[in-house]
Amino acid sequence: MTSQKSSLAVLTVGAIGVVYGDIGTSVLYAIKEVFGSGHVPFTPDNVYGILSIFFWTLTVIVSLKYVSLVLRADNNGEGGLIAMLALASTAVQDRPELRKVLLLVGIFGTSLFYGDGVITPAISVLSAVEGLEVISPTFTKAVIPTTLVILFGLFAMQKHGTAGIGKFFGPITIVWFAVLALLGVSQIVTHPEILFALSPHYALMFMWENPGITFIILGAVVLCVTGAEALYADLGHFGKKPIRLAWFSVVMPSLVLNYFGQGALLLSNPAAVKNPFYLMAPDWALIPLVVLATLATVIASQALITGAFSVTKQAIQMGYLPRLRILHTSVRDTGQIYMPFVNWGLFVTIVLAVVMFRSSSNLAAAYGIAVCTDMLITTILTFYVIRYGWKYPLALCIAATSVFFLVDFAFFASNLMKLFAGGWFPLVIGGAVFTLMITWKQGRQILNEKLRTDAIDLSSFLDAVFVSPPLRVEGTAVFMTAEPGIVPNAMLHNLKHNKVLHDQNLFVTVVNHEVPWIGMDKRLQVESLGHDCWQVNIHYGFKNDLDLPRALQQIKNRGCQLEPMTTSYFLSRDTVIPTIGSGMAAWREKLFAQMHHNASGAADFLNLPNNSVVELGSKIEI
């Protein structure tokens, strides 16, 4: 029992550091953006109304939707939009048209994650460093250079992994939330009546009396729940209980106290709207607070960068992106990965965002629309999981999701008003990634269909070859095939040029599934083809690490004597030639061909030993 409690405590601390970093740094800019917009006159009733809207937004979207409902929709213990998409698409398997629509919606939501991934580090770090302006206006010119230096350091350290410093994330973030609570309480004691704003009465009265203003400010209010989707995305790392315990015991109380403290400060000093978070602190605490806020925003950004690596890897294994170079940064934790292309691509785009928008207030206009779209998509997918996956009655499904849908849609509609003020930026990024993903998926389908059309049946081919067998050489040849039962081009080239076959020949197909994990006991499916040849299907979930040599070690129990030192891996390196009439627009054909050309080699992706790989090229017209 003691060890279970200890484990729960460790996981809860870890969840506070990783899951809640983003939502925990929203206090830096959320209240400032609502009151600083000029749409809300400074009256006590308006302050009460806004604080009440903040509290009930946190309650409805985070406590009720994500913590109470969405966390239940785990995919074999895993969460995140891709896991939810896999659940929903499986649930409507017998409805192909609906499944196609849900897949497109889910992939679009996944693409928007990258748009959010650019804005979050930019606005978080920038808003923390803007505390320097509160210390002294002379620091104003240093804000952007300092932000860029911090961001560069953050991205430069990714290749070294975060295993060493990651253990400090939880404790630092706990200190951050404790400081949030203390700052809030220090102001609330001057206006304890501010706590009356916990009543929904004030939110409802504000919305009733100011419907137009309410609609406008929802675009800023949503900033208090940015990062809520991380609760679900990190489900597999920490589990439901630690995430829920962290939210209700530490995170939500600290956030509410801080927001209400900022409200109390504004009642005393409306001029504090220029930066209410930092102005709650005494002068002597400003420098330490800026340092702590910067650390908190770096941790929040780190969680998002790690999430970008993870989501990209999952998308690759589900066939929506080409192979990219993946480096493991930890020997003990295979989930610790580094993807150079994703890392520096994010960095360049984030730098562009900081230089273009130049302040957290300007970035706030760009923030929200991608998050709201993802929240809306999550609600839609949750409905289909509950209805068709869990088989709940339609009326109950509508009751469970309709309120969340209406709330999400209200925030989404409000954020559309920010489209031309900066909201276009994450949408352009998300749209570009979406185009890449659907182009790659469709291109691979066309390419595989072309390979099937030109394919030679493997079993018949082997029977014909062994009528007059070529020279056999010692060792084992592993031929990779896109689909089982067809002759790989690498084998045809090997016979044509080398005129030999190995003593043992394995025809290996990697089969990726829409589930997070497939255990080693279900990894291999082996069929003997005779002549010391085997068809081997290796099954992976989208969160499994691909390690072909390790998986093939199991074949020793199936009659094949596989020795690493005498095993050669034959790969086909195809060059795609775009042609007219493939079913894709000409520009998308060229885009697919370029993506195919630039894809990382299969050898690295499958963890094959470099000194045992033979690549043979061919050209394929699509």
UniProtKB/Swiss-Prot annotation:
Protein's cellular compartments: Cell inner membrane
Keyword Nucleotide-binding listed: no
Single GO term (MF): symporter activity
InterPro entries in the record: K+_transporter (IPR003855), K_trans_C (IPR053952), K_trans_N (IPR053951), Kup (IPR023051)
Family: Belongs to the HAK/KUP transporter (TC 2.A.72) family.
Gene this chain is encoded by: kup
Taxonomic classification: Bacteria, Pseudomonadati, Pseudomonadota, Betaproteobacteria, Burkholderiales
Record field: transmembrane: 8-28, 50-70, 101-121, 137-157, 165-185, 213-233, 247-267, 285-305, 337-357, 366-386, 393-413, 419-439
Protein name: Probable potassium transport system protein Kup
Transport among keywords: yes
Subcellular location, principal: membrane
Native source organism of the sequence: Polaromonas naphthalenivorans (strain CJ2)
